[in-house]
């Protein structure tokens, strides 16, 4: 029985020694006082720099081609009422130019005089389609222009190109006979702005 008693006593002693976790002292939370942000200093006013002027001025294509057309019309080698194929103006400058506007201005100036009968843009489009050329094809070479002129039964072809520096280009025109390819008139002049 002593054994039972010693075991019971040991059990009581051991149950009384339950370990508790140590209590850590709690510190009060640190209070952070709000800080007002510093007011940013406004930078001194900046002088606005004006944008540079645009270098690209509009081109007066009609004024550029009228003197050349006047010279061509006064040529003795061309009969009144001749059929003319107007090829689109080519850009051979070192930049971009609105050559479609140049072609349109040239068409208007030529339409206003009675020396030539112009092949209509519709006839030209049909002929290009028949020959397998796209409508945007500017014919690019004199030989293509002459071949197309023969196809539409034109007597003459006006081949024009703009060359030189894009800031001060020169327009050149050549009037050629469609049957022989002979240049019967040639002229050039500055492009006017």
UniProtKB/Swiss-Prot annotation:
Lipid-carrying residues in chain (N-palmitoyl cysteine): 17
Keyword Membrane on entry: yes
GO biological process entries: peptidoglycan biosynthetic process; regulation of cell shape
Keyword Hydrolase appears in the UniProt entry: no
Pfam families: LPAM_1, LpoB
Keywords: Cell outer membrane, Cell shape, Lipoprotein, Membrane, Palmitate, Peptidoglycan synthesis, Signal
Lipidation (S-diacylglycerol cysteine): 17
Function statement: Regulator of peptidoglycan synthesis that is essential for the function of penicillin-binding protein 1B (PBP1b).
UniProt similarity note: Belongs to the LpoB family.
PROSITE patterns on file: PROKAR_LIPOPROTEIN
Ranges that cross the membrane: none
GO cellular component, one term: periplasmic side of cell outer membrane
Gene3D superfamilies tied to this protein: ABC-type transport auxiliary lipoprotein component
Region (Disordered): 24-55
Lineage, opening ranks: Bacteria, Pseudomonadati, Pseudomonadota, Gammaproteobacteria, Enterobacterales
Main location: membrane
Assembly and binders: Interacts with PBP1b.
Descriptive protein name: Penicillin-binding protein activator LpoB
Membrane topology (UniProt): Lipid-anchor
HAMAP family to which the protein is assigned, alphabetical: LpoB (MF_01889)
Signal peptide: 1-16
Localization annotation: Cell outer membrane
Compositional bias per record (Pro residues), positions renumbered to this chain: 35-54
